[in-house]
């Protein structure tokens, strides 16, 4: 849809409208050769308490000499903690990066507002680690702190990636937490929850 509406590739659109204005110089679907030594190794569990490097292609996450032909709206970006913070901070500031307007405030409210009916909420609640949350139009939203069993504020929002990239914005406390691992299927793990509780305590 983005490519049809804009007339350019999805990655180019993100660079022009989001990454560039936010100064996210290390974010994209393709990792240039000169930056590859900075890339963290991805791991997977092979036995309890043991890891090995993950070498498969999944969700468009791959490192090759050629740009990925499929630029997904849900996976495949490479980034850094600093760049991710710029994105999260823009959302926390209602769509602004300093004096630069990236998204309209109404758009940010739409992204971070509740969007599930009762049937879909029942299905969403079965995801591991997301008790006490709902899903908005972009990410998870905390609705019941006691049910979630975590510290935080009702209305906080964020998401986690398949390799354990986790972020949360708390608009009440004005806190952003970014936690990055490189392990497949890490998601909203117990470790992530413990770290969040430490930071928010």
Indicate residue ranges for each PLM-predicted region.
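Short, structured beta-strand/loop micro-motifs enriched in basic residues and often containing a Trp
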Residues: 158
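Short, surface-exposed loop or secondary-structure junction motifs
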Residues: 1-151
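Extracellular/periplasmic catalytic domains that process cell-envelope and extracellular macromolecules
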Residues: 132-133, 169-171
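Generic C-terminus detector
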Residues: 182-201
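Short, well-ordered beta-strand micro-motif
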Residues: 140-141, 168-170
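Short, well-ordered beta-strand elements
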Residues: 166-168, 174-183
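Short, small/polar residue-rich loop motifs at catalytic or cofactor-binding pockets
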Residues: 161-163
